[in-house]
């Protein structure tokens, strides 16, 4: 995953230096942008060359901040117990292809990179359980939604260890 390697590289850079991160996953754009924002670094942009995405991130301060973990975490078991409750919404922030191959029944898919522009689709009256593959993207999504006043819970460990019913749309 580009973020893990980027974190290691950022620790070796001087403030103001720029790192290029190459990836082929379209979801890496949203992941790196959200991570950079949450750690105080500056996401400069992406250049697409064929199937390769070249992301650029500038180290903004002398010490990289750790991305804060969202304070409210629930387990997969909790989500399974409440998934049919009309006062809850399961929000899957994985990429569309990931969601299509396997997702929690009734979950709504808004990829992390689209969350900011599609936030109006969410109901502020509902408790939103945010899920991704491992809890990293959902953590970033929870921070964004919490800042906008939503009642959110980060689902850990997420789809990587989901043992309950799933749906497939492909």
Question: What spans do the regions from the language model cover?
Answer:
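Rhodanese-like catalytic fold shared by cysteine-dependent sulfurtransferases
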Residues: 5, 33-89, 96-127, 136-170
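Residue-level detector of alpha-helix initiation sites
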Residues: 27, 133-136
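Short glycine-rich, basic-tinged beta-strand/loop micro-motifs
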Residues: 12-22
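A short alpha-helix capping/helix-coil boundary motif
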Residues: 10-14, 119-122
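An N-terminal amphipathic alpha-helical segment
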Residues: 1-13
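Short, structured protein-protein interaction patches enriched in aromatics and acidic/basic residues
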Residues: 21-31, 37-39
